[in-house]
């Protein structure tokens, strides 16, 4: 069990957070309440796949105005705004800045898919975990205010001095707290498959089993580790019930060695209730002509998703 020495408030986690969550779960009172047009309802048709951009690295140097313009011109329907980039969308924004950003998205055909935080919950120190939970809540509030539908978070490693299972449970219980908070704001918590050790599929599955909240979903990250052990199909299927969003990489031939046709076959058949359909371009290699690369990827995406 995590130990927090915080007073109870809307932004502070406590032991009672865990207790109340356990009670609510046992009574069946927790339900997904994010926008129904982005989540799959039981028995509905497959969710259409949509191409968006993560500002890492292709959009990190663009202002919000330029970012929306480039996405519009290259037919990217949405954007996940990674924290600390030039767009300036941060929890520290004042009311006027938030109002302006909200209007920018309202006036654009490009949707705010959500915010990409670096919040993580694996630290040995409870105070550090608590700080990350508080930061996550601030990102949730901002995403909801600006019209987004979720916040990306991540696991980021397994401290060597702590048993692996204990760290996985700590991450999962922290996700329960932020997932419960996100539900009140119609937001998802999107856990990126990330981090040394934590990105291994059995560990991610364990984290999600502990989290056990409908507003906590997986952001499939298209990692090389997806292909180890039992292979892509089995690894994807292990996390498929929790699928929410996808971070894809450069789809052009010869760029990234990944089974893209197999992935898109899985995505088109997804029955995950939290799957939004968003496939978000995130690639660490910066092409010399980013808009041209985006257009070329859009063409490949259309072929793979049809």
PLM ranges: what are they?
Residues 2-52, 61-75, 198-306:
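Histidine-acidic metal/acid-base catalytic patches
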Residues 17, 22-32, 43-45, 68, ...:
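Active-site acidic/histidine proton-transfer and metal-coordination neighborhood
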Residues 57-59, 83-85, 119-121, 155-159, ...:
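Active-site-proximal loop/turn and secondary-structure-junction residues that shape catalytic pockets
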Residues 65-72, 95-107, 137-145, 233-237, ...:
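Short amphipathic alpha-helices and their capping/turn segments at secondary-structure boundaries
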Residues 67-84, 147:
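Catalytic domains of carbohydrate-active enzymes, especially glycoside hydrolases
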Residues 77, 111, 149, 276-277:
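Short acidic/polar active-site loop segments enriched in Thr and Asp
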Residues 80, 114-116, 152, 247, ...:
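Conserved beta-strand positions in the central sheet of alpha/beta enzyme cores
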Residues 82-102, 156-162:
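Glycine-rich, proline-tolerant flexible connector loops at the mouths of alpha/beta enzymes
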């Amino acid at each position: 069990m995590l130990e927090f020495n915080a007073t109870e408030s809307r932004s502070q986690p406590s032991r009672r957070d865990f207790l109340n969550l356990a009670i609510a779960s046992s009574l069946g009172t927790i339900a997904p309440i994010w926008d129904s047009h982005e989540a799959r309802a039981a028995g509905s048709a497959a969710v259409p796949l949509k191409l968006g951009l993560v500002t890492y690295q292709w959009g990190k140097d663009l202002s919000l105005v330029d970012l929306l313009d480039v996405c519009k011109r290259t037919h990217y329907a949405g954007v996940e705004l990674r924290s600390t980039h030039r767009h300036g969308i941060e929890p520290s924004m004042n009311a006027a800045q938030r109002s302006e950003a909200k209007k920018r998205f309202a006036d654009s055909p490009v949707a705010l898919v959500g915010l990409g935080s670096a919040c993580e919950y694996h630290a040995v120190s409870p105070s550090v975990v608590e700080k990350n939970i508080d930061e996550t809540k601030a990102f949730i509030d901002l995403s909801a205010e600006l019209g987004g539908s979720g916040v990306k978070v991540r696991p980021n490693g397994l401290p060597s001095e702590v048993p692996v299972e204990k760290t996985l449970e700590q991450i999962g219980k922290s996700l329960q707290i932020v997932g419960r908070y996100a539900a009140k704001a119609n937001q998802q918590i999107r856990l990126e498959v990330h981090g040394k050790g934590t990105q291994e599929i059995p560990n991610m599955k364990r984290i999600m089993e502990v989290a056990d909240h409908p507003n906590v979903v997986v952001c499939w990250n298209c990692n090389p580790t997806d292909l180890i052990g039992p292979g892509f199909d089995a690894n994807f299927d292990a996390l498929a019930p929790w699928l929410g969003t996808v971070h894809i990489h450069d789809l052009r031939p010869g760029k990234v060695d990944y089974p893209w046709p197999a992935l898109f076959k899985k995505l088109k058949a997804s029955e995950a209730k939290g799957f939004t359909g968003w496939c978000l371009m995130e690639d660490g290699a910066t092409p010399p002509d980013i808009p041209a690369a985006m257009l070329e990827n859009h063409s490949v995406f259309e072929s793979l998703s049809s």
